[in-house]
Curated annotation (Swiss-Prot):
This is Translation initiation factor eIF2 assembly protein. It is found in: Cytoplasm. The lineage of its organism: Eukaryota, Metazoa, Chordata, Craniata, Vertebrata. Mg(2+) binds at residues 247, 249. It holds the Pfam family D123. Disulfide bonds: none annotated. The keyword Calcium does not apply. PANTHER family: CELL DIVISION CYCLE PROTEIN 123 HOMOLOG, D123 PROTEIN. One of its GO terms (biological process) is eukaryotic translation initiation factor 2 complex assembly. Signal peptide: none annotated. ATP binds at residues 105, 108, 110, 112, 168-171, 178, 180, 194, 234, 247, 249. One of its GO terms (molecular function) is magnesium ion binding.
Length: 338
């Protein structure tokens, strides 16, 4: 895998070409001070409130959200949330233009590993505060910032990256309708159920139709239109049978191979013994979770306990412990005022 392949999978690189097959999205350049804030290490504390203008139908998940502030300064008496007025306006305008709720991501990754920290246990965001909370809690987002080329073989200097905030119109996607597709030398060689921890009866019953429809979509719209010969793309097949392009990913270890192994994929799956799902060598191998497989825990469960909390419990970071105690004291003061 080369650095150029990673760069080609940035959302802003492929979306203009394939936008008519994808979910409506807005791309906003990420200011350097916002990037610095997102990378600033510390303990999450509550310091203010923010309203989301433009949410015409507000539900329990679209309410006033707490802004966030991180601090490592034990002498800080009053904690105030950072302000990015111009950026905040652009983000809120984009959220409103997309219907009031969005799914956020960076150039490559979304904060899927941080969904648990949101009040609604969802990646659905209605304010910039929602986005900050997810991004600052996500190892995936941190990886985009700090190690985007970690698995690349070429030793050339890392190219300069212009980071972007991607806001995608919020859609209620059914996990059992998401699939990951693996392309080698511009040939679709493998398709995997995205949510491999669950068994979905409709996938087993419709496997041939699913495989053929994905292959047709690839041949008509993706093949030879992406700048690399080897890549991975994710799709969603809706209830009407329409296929939506969700994302592109590099062909390599940085991308989860799901029900395949990278060793198999690099062999083009042609000589994989006993692969009953690849009887026709002209068709991609389609793997899905069968009924006999025990339901597995979510792969994101391991991200549910932030290192900051571990540091607090073990006393390894005294400054964070002081911030945590200050937060509790402030909450008690607020309760007594009420």
């Amino acid at each position: 895998m080369k650095k150029e392949q990673v760069l080609n999978c940035q959302f802003g690189q492929w979306y203009p070409t394939f936008k008519k097959f994808s979910i409506r999205s807005v791309i906003i350049p990420l200011p350097e001070n916002v990037k610095d804030y997102l990378l600033d290490d510390g303990t999450l504390v509550v310091s203010g409130r923010e309203e989301s203008p433009g949410c015409s139908q507000r539900d329990l998940n679209c309410t006033e959200e707490d802004e966030v502030q991180w601090s490592d300064d034990e002498s800080t008496a009053t904690l105030t949330a950072p302000e990015f007025p111009e950026f905040s306006i652009k983000v809120q305008e984009a959220i409103n233009s997309l219907g009031g709720s969005v799914f956020p991501k960076l150039n490559w990754s979304s904060p899927r590993d941080a969904y648990w920290i949101a009040l609604n246990s969802s990646l659905k965001c209605t304010t910039l505060s929602d986005i900050f909370l997810l991004f600052k809690s996500s190892d995936f987002v941190t990886h985009d910032f700090t190690q985007p080329f970690i698995y690349c073989a070429d030793d050339s200097p890392d190219p300069n990256i212009k980071y972007e905030l991607v806001l995608r119109k919020w859609c209620e996607l059914i996990p059992g309708a998401e699939f990951r597709c693996f392309v080698r030398e511009n040939k679709l060689i493998g398709i995997s159920q995205r949510d491999y921890t669950q068994y979905y009866d409709h996938i087993s019953k419709q496997k041939e139709e699913i495989r053929k429809s994905i292959q047709y979509f690839f041949q008509e719209h993706i093949q030879y239109n992406f700048p690399d010969e080897d890549f991975v793309f994710d799709i969603y097949k809706d209830s009407q049978g329409k296929i939506w392009l969700i994302d592109f990913n590099p062909f390599g270890e940085v991308t989860d191979s799901l029900l395949f192994t990278w060793e198999e994929l690099r062999r083009n799956l042609c000589d994989v013994p006993g692969d009953v799902e690849n009887e026709d060598q002209d068709c991609p191998t389609f793997r899905y979770t069968n009924r006999e497989v025990t339901v597995q825990p979510s792969p994101y469960l391991s991200y549910r306990l932030p290192k900051d909390f571990v540091d607090l419990s073990t006393g390894e970071d005294a400054h964070k412990l002081i911030d945590f105690l200050k937060l509790n004291r402030n909450r008690q003061d607020e309760d007594s005022d009420d």
